């Protein structure tokens, strides 16, 4: 599954702290079994088990352990959760929605221009949406402001 993700839009970020360093406010990215196995080919001891078959990347001092020298050291194999951010999928009243977190770091219109790429990715991940949406690791994210972009029909 090829998706460059949204990180390319963050290159002009004016924040002194990168989102990969804000896990006191954000939740550590979720990773699937497949992502865990892929990363495990190169690294060990990098995840915590959240639920059966659902894992999160470890953090140290609120920073992703793969964020080194202002770069992602696993960029080419980074988890889907990282590729999607600041988009996310939430469940409300038994419906699923694509949302965009309101970031104060850049103009959200830049992210809205990525909708074709994101919609294509959403189609590919539909089989796993129910497994990964609104799990217990969503607790910090629920306090973040967001806009609902569209309903996702599963």
What are these regions (language model features)?
Residues 1-154:
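Short loop/turn segments that flank or connect secondary-structure elements
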């Amino acid at each position: 599954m090829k998706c460059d993700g949204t990180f390319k839009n963050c290159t002009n970020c004016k924040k002194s702290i990168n989102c990969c360093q804000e896990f006191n406010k954000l939740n550590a990215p979720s990773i699937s079994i497949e992502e865990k196995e892929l990363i495990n080919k190169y690294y060990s001891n990098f995840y915590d088990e959240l639920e059966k078959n659902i894992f999160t990347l470890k953090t140290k001092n609120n920073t992703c352990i793969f964020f080194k020298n202002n770069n992602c050291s696993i960029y080419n194999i980074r988890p889907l959760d990282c590729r999607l951010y600041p988009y996310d999928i939430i469940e409300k009243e038994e419906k699923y929605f694509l949302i965009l977190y309101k970031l104060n770091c850049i103009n959200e219109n830049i992210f809205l221009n990525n909708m074709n790429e994101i919609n294509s990715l959403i189609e590919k991940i539909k089989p796993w949406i129910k497994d990964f949406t609104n799990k217990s690791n969503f607790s910090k994210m629920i306090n973040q402001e967001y806009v609902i972009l569209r309903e996702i029909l599963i």
